């Protein structure tokens, strides 16, 4: 459970990562986008993205994606910092759940309220299938979706 706790703490402490999608233009190639996110109560990443963005077009063709979140470290300590790869499927948040997603997202990114209602923007959510967590040298491994969702980000272990 230590890795699950670490992954949840890391994802909760940061608000941007690299969203990796499968390129719709170049089949078989990954496409990474620096993307702000927030978490819902289950630790699922929420995104506010435009239909014009390449990553949104990629998700429409293939919803499987990864979100890489890492600690901000100096060049000397880059590999010793924690990082997590959240793997899952990304889809637009259903209308009935949009108010809760909006509230969670705008709490972390209040400036996004300026464009949240533009016609080409919508809230998306990743349903996490599995997480690969690296807590530094010697602490790494896969975390199940249920362990990740059940971990308390405020807990120290």
List where the protein language model places each region.
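Short, surface-exposed beta-edge/turn micro-motifs
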Residues: 16, 43-45, 62-65, 118-121, ...
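A generic local secondary-structure boundary/capping motif
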Residues: 8, 112-115
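Short, structured beta-strand-loop surface elements
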Residues: 54-108, 118-121
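An N-terminal domain-cap segment
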Residues: 1-60, 68
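C-terminal edge-of-domain segments
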Residues: 114-157
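Solvent-exposed residues in well-ordered beta-strands and their adjoining turns
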Residues: 40, 50, 91-93, 127-129
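Short secondary-structure junctions and interdomain/linker hinges
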Residues: 14-18, 111-113, 133
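Conserved hydrophobic/aromatic beta-strand scaffold that supports enzyme active sites
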Residues: 18, 32-36, 85-87, 123-125, ...
